[in-house]
Regions:
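Short, charged/polar, Gly/Pro-enriched secondary-structure boundary elements
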Residues: 41-48, 156-159, 398
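Conserved S-adenosyl-L-methionine
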Residues: 176-310
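SAM-dependent Rossmann-like transferase core, predominantly class I methyltransferases
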Residues: 149-189
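C-terminal catalytic and target-recognition region of SAM-dependent MTase-like enzymes
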Residues: 307-435
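Non-catalytic nucleic-acid substrate-recognition regions in nucleic-acid-modifying enzymes
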Residues: 1-136, 199
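C-terminal edge-of-domain segments
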Residues: 138-152, 386-391, 409
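Phosphate-coordination loops involved in phosphoryl transfer and adenosine-cofactor binding
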Residues: 86-89, 208, 271-272, 353
Length: 435
């Protein structure tokens, strides 16, 4: 079977890597998606375990669709009576165009007519349409003279997984969406840190894998970090799935995978790690504390004052560490202090090898740390332009040291329009990368 997982732009590489780690075969990265092949179980695994995918689709057919009549005939030829569960409601969404099919609403309507006519002919009953909340959501994709139609196995987007109590607690506040949080955490290897086996020296020194959220905002990064630490399947709590309206759905197989997920979560109770959270903005920290408490994760997260010495004291001895931050909603009046804090943490010997990943705007983080990011990923959290900047501090330290002589890599020149330049003045700490 052919599947694909859709994702926001910028997620593709991380999503492909994630699907490979899940054991899926023939994974291929494309724009806005990653494709894979396998049996029904592989599709289920992607639904249950992917933290980065927006939706997972099973491709039902590919065909010629040069015009409306050819589209109708091709969709009609699909054996819908073996695909759609009797009595299930449907909805069809169309994307893309061909030379003659330029209106996506018309294309979706034509495909719907073909599907319903086929069911009426073979079963004696047309499918009911529920555009808002269907049992089966189908996606028609058109390009040039070709088309494909796929079944959305997810139902609601997979990133809609915040605990209900936390969702209510975060109403009106900036809470980073879980898939964006997972992308940030993937850049610093948080999953690998959580899976790390402690050594005898670690136990003797009380050293633990440590995550420092230096700008915890509304708590989105913290919630996802705890879910990874506890090995909680991101889809385990979902009550409704798009594949339930599919005749190929195997309830016994799905329950088997859920049981496996419960076993993994139980085994993860032996894991030990520290998560330390701070924020320069008192209102943001208050929201994060409320979110963490409402999600039932209070025992996993240690909130402390936004001072580097205090953060390092709470972090204690580390057995591998990472620093993350979401500064996209940090007030401009507090940005200087936020960047100063991250810079001071960067210079701490305890965190010399810790990677830093931060969601930021205008390249502020790299400029504040006087270091080129190892990679910068353009993303759109809250539908606003931002960058996920990743700095490997161990690598940077090696590049900055010659034979006892500091060698700084020059930053790429960045243009700031005169109209916007004043708002950046005073945001960057003086020589925060020195030390």
């Amino acid at each position: 079977m052919e599947f694909y997982a859709s994702c926001p732009e910028g997620f593709e590489s991380a999503l492909a890597d994630e699907l490979k780690r899940l054991g899926l075969s023939h994974v291929r990265r494309l724009k806005g998606r990653a494709t894979f092949e396998g049996e029904l179980e592989e599709g289920y695994r992607a639904c249950l375990w992917s933290r980065l995918a927006s939706r997972v689709f099973a491709v039902l057919g590919r065909f010629e669709a040069q015009d409306a009549d050819e589209l109708y005939d091709s969709v009609y030829d699909i054996a819908w009576e073996t695909i759609i569960r009797p009595g299930a409601t449907i909805a069809i969404t169309a994307r893309g165009v061909t030379e003659q099919l330029r209106n996506t609403r018309f294309s979706a309507l034509r495909a719907k007519d073909a599907l319903c006519d086929r069911l009426a002919e073979t079963t004696g009953r047309r499918a009911d349409v529920d555009a808002a909340d269907p049992d089966v959501h189908l996606l028609l994709s058109l390009r040039q003279r070709r088309a494909s139609i796929s079944l959305d196995l997810s139902g609601d987007p997979l990133f809609k997984r915040l605990p209900p109590a936390a969702t209510r607690a975060g109403e009106g506040a900036h809470v980073l969406r879980p898939d964006y949080a997972a992308l940030v955490l993937a850049q610093v290897g948080w999953t690998a840190l959580c899976e790390r086996e402690l050594t005898a020296d670690d136990y003797e020194n009380e050293a633990l894998p440590t995550l420092i959220d230096a700008s915890c905002a509304g708590g989105g990064l913290l919630l996802e970090a705890v879910n990874i630490l506890t090995d909680r399947a991101p889809g385990a709590a979902r009550e409704r799935w798009g594949f339930e309206g599919w005749q190929l759905h195997d309830a016994a197989l799905w329950e088997q995978l859920l049981a496996e997920a419960r076993e993994r979560e139980a085994a993860a109770r032996e894991r030990q790690a520290r998560i330390v959270a701070v924020d320069i903005d008192p209102a943001a920290r208050k929201t994060a504390e409320r979110m963490v408490k409402c999600a039932g994760y209070k025992r996993f997260v240690d909130f402390c004052a936004a001072k580097s010495a205090t953060v390092l004291d709470h972090a204690g001895a580390v057995a591998g560490a990472a620093v993350v931050a979401d500064t996209t909603e940090t007030p401009l009046s507090l940005m200087h202090d936020a960047m100063t804090l991250i810079g001071e943490l960067r210079r701490a010997p305890e965190l010399a090898a810790a990677p830093v990943a931060a969601l930021t705007r205008d390249g502020l983080l790299a400029r504040a740390l006087h270091a080129e990011p190892e990679r910068s990923i353009a993303v759109m959290p809250n539908n606003e332009e931002a960058a996920l900047e990743v700095l490997d501090l161990a690598r940077i330290a090696g590049e900055e040291q010659g034979d006892g002589v500091r060698v700084r890599r020059p930053l790429r020149a960045r243009r700031i329009d005169a109209a916007s330049a004043p708002e950046h003045r005073g945001l960057l700490p003086d020589r925060v990368g020195e030390g």
